[in-house]
Amino acid sequence: MAGNGVASIGECMLELSGQAGPNWRMGFAGDTFNTLWALHALSGDRPATYVSAFGDDPFSRDQIDFFAQNGIGIGASPIIPGARPGLYAITLTGAERSFTYWRGDAAARQLASDAAALAKSLENQALVYFSGITLAILDDAARKTLLA
Protein backbone atom coordinates (compact mmCIF):
# COMPACT_ATOMS: atom_id res chain seq x y z
CA MET A 1 0.00 0.00 0.00
CA ALA A 2 1.36 3.41 -0.94
CA GLY A 3 1.94 5.90 1.82
CA ASN A 4 0.32 9.27 2.11
CA GLY A 5 3.29 11.42 3.12
CA VAL A 6 4.99 14.24 1.26
CA ALA A 7 8.77 14.53 1.21
CA SER A 8 11.18 17.07 -0.17
CA ILE A 9 14.88 16.40 -0.70
CA GLY A 10 17.50 19.13 -0.64
CA GLU A 11 19.29 21.81 1.31
CA CYS A 12 17.56 24.08 3.78
CA MET A 13 19.94 26.90 4.59
CA LEU A 14 20.26 29.51 7.26
CA GLU A 15 18.92 32.75 5.82
CA LEU A 16 20.13 36.14 7.03
CA SER A 17 17.84 38.98 5.99
CA GLY A 18 16.38 42.27 7.16
CA GLN A 19 19.68 43.94 7.93
CA ALA A 20 19.15 46.86 10.28
CA GLY A 21 22.54 48.33 11.05
CA PRO A 22 24.74 45.51 12.31
CA ASN A 23 21.72 43.30 13.13
CA TRP A 24 20.25 40.56 10.94
CA ARG A 25 17.18 38.33 11.18
CA MET A 26 17.91 34.62 10.85
CA GLY A 27 15.49 32.09 9.42
CA PHE A 28 15.51 28.84 7.46
CA ALA A 29 14.81 28.67 3.73
CA GLY A 30 15.70 27.14 0.40
CA ASP A 31 13.84 26.04 -2.71
CA THR A 32 12.98 22.52 -1.57
CA PHE A 33 12.17 23.54 1.99
CA ASN A 34 9.93 26.39 0.85
CA THR A 35 8.10 23.96 -1.45
CA LEU A 36 7.60 21.44 1.36
CA TRP A 37 6.37 24.22 3.66
CA ALA A 38 3.66 25.13 1.14
CA LEU A 39 2.75 21.48 0.44
CA HIS A 40 2.51 20.81 4.17
CA ALA A 41 0.26 23.83 4.68
CA LEU A 42 -2.02 22.66 1.85
CA SER A 43 -2.01 18.92 2.52
CA GLY A 44 -3.96 18.77 5.76
CA ASP A 45 -2.92 15.79 7.84
CA ARG A 46 -0.38 14.25 5.44
CA PRO A 47 2.97 13.62 7.13
CA ALA A 48 5.73 15.94 5.85
CA THR A 49 9.40 14.94 5.75
CA TYR A 50 12.41 17.06 4.85
CA VAL A 51 15.16 14.76 3.60
CA SER A 52 18.67 16.15 3.81
CA ALA A 53 21.81 15.77 5.90
CA PHE A 54 22.40 17.90 8.95
CA GLY A 55 25.37 18.95 11.04
CA ASP A 56 25.80 18.40 14.75
CA ASP A 57 26.18 22.12 15.49
CA PRO A 58 23.71 24.38 17.35
CA PHE A 59 22.32 25.88 14.12
CA SER A 60 21.51 22.45 12.70
CA ARG A 61 19.82 21.49 15.97
CA ASP A 62 17.79 24.72 15.84
CA GLN A 63 16.81 23.90 12.26
CA ILE A 64 15.65 20.38 13.16
CA ASP A 65 13.76 21.75 16.18
CA PHE A 66 12.07 24.37 13.97
CA PHE A 67 10.95 21.65 11.58
CA ALA A 68 9.57 19.53 14.43
CA GLN A 69 7.71 22.48 15.98
CA ASN A 70 6.00 22.93 12.62
CA GLY A 71 5.08 19.29 12.07
CA ILE A 72 7.90 18.45 9.66
CA GLY A 73 10.08 15.40 10.30
CA ILE A 74 13.52 14.58 8.95
CA GLY A 75 13.05 10.84 8.44
CA ALA A 76 16.34 8.99 8.70
CA SER A 77 18.39 11.96 7.45
CA PRO A 78 21.95 11.61 8.74
CA ILE A 79 23.56 13.89 11.32
CA ILE A 80 27.13 14.45 10.09
CA PRO A 81 29.69 15.09 12.86
CA GLY A 82 31.51 18.37 12.30
CA ALA A 83 29.22 19.47 9.46
CA ARG A 84 27.00 22.55 9.44
CA PRO A 85 24.25 24.04 7.29
CA GLY A 86 24.73 26.27 4.28
CA LEU A 87 24.18 29.99 4.80
CA TYR A 88 23.06 32.86 2.63
CA ALA A 89 22.47 36.55 3.20
CA ILE A 90 20.06 38.85 1.39
CA THR A 91 21.20 42.44 1.01
CA LEU A 92 19.23 45.33 -0.44
CA THR A 93 20.48 48.17 -2.59
CA GLY A 94 17.39 50.28 -3.11
CA ALA A 95 14.81 47.78 -4.33
CA GLU A 96 17.44 45.37 -5.72
CA ARG A 97 17.99 42.18 -3.70
CA SER A 98 21.39 40.47 -3.83
CA PHE A 99 22.27 37.05 -2.47
CA THR A 100 25.61 35.93 -1.05
CA TYR A 101 26.10 32.21 -0.37
CA TRP A 102 28.36 30.17 1.90
CA ARG A 103 27.49 26.57 1.11
CA GLY A 104 30.58 24.83 -0.25
CA ASP A 105 30.89 22.44 2.69
CA ALA A 106 27.23 22.27 3.73
CA ALA A 107 26.04 19.06 5.37
CA ALA A 108 23.30 18.71 2.73
CA ARG A 109 25.95 17.82 0.14
CA GLN A 110 26.11 14.46 1.95
CA LEU A 111 22.35 13.75 1.91
CA ALA A 112 22.84 10.65 -0.25
CA SER A 113 25.95 9.37 1.54
CA ASP A 114 23.89 6.66 3.26
CA ALA A 115 21.70 4.98 0.63
CA ALA A 116 19.80 2.94 3.24
CA ALA A 117 18.94 6.04 5.30
CA LEU A 118 17.83 7.85 2.15
CA ALA A 119 15.58 4.94 1.16
CA LYS A 120 14.13 4.74 4.67
CA SER A 121 13.37 8.48 4.63
CA LEU A 122 11.42 8.03 1.40
CA GLU A 123 9.29 5.08 2.57
CA ASN A 124 5.54 5.72 2.72
CA GLN A 125 5.71 8.88 0.65
CA ALA A 126 2.95 9.56 -1.85
CA LEU A 127 4.89 12.51 -3.26
CA VAL A 128 8.65 13.11 -3.38
CA TYR A 129 10.02 16.44 -4.59
CA PHE A 130 13.56 17.55 -5.37
CA SER A 131 14.94 20.29 -7.57
CA GLY A 132 17.74 20.99 -9.97
CA ILE A 133 19.55 22.66 -7.09
CA THR A 134 19.32 19.39 -5.14
CA LEU A 135 21.06 17.63 -8.02
CA ALA A 136 23.62 20.44 -8.39
CA ILE A 137 24.86 20.25 -4.78
CA LEU A 138 25.57 16.51 -5.07
CA ASP A 139 28.62 14.87 -6.61
CA ASP A 140 28.15 12.28 -9.38
CA ALA A 141 28.03 9.28 -7.03
CA ALA A 142 25.48 10.95 -4.74
CA ARG A 143 23.31 11.93 -7.73
CA LYS A 144 23.31 8.29 -8.87
CA THR A 145 22.32 7.15 -5.38
CA LEU A 146 19.48 9.67 -5.22
CA LEU A 147 18.15 8.75 -8.65
CA ALA A 148 18.49 4.97 -8.16
Where are these regions (language model features)?
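Short amphipathic alpha-helices and their capping/turn segments at secondary-structure boundaries
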Residues: 1-4, 113-121, 142-148
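Glycine-rich phosphate/adenosyl-contacting loop at the front of the ribokinase-like
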Residues: 1-69
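Conserved N-terminal subdomain of the carbohydrate kinase-like
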Residues: 16, 47-133
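Alpha-helix termini
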Residues: 23, 42-43, 84, 117, ...
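A structural preference for long, well-packed, hydrophobic secondary-structure segments
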Residues: 26, 37-41, 100, 134, ...
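Conserved phosphate-coordination/catalytic loops
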Residues: 26-30, 112, 140-141
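Conserved beta-alpha-beta core of the PfkB/ribokinase-like small-molecule kinase fold
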Residues: 127, 132-148
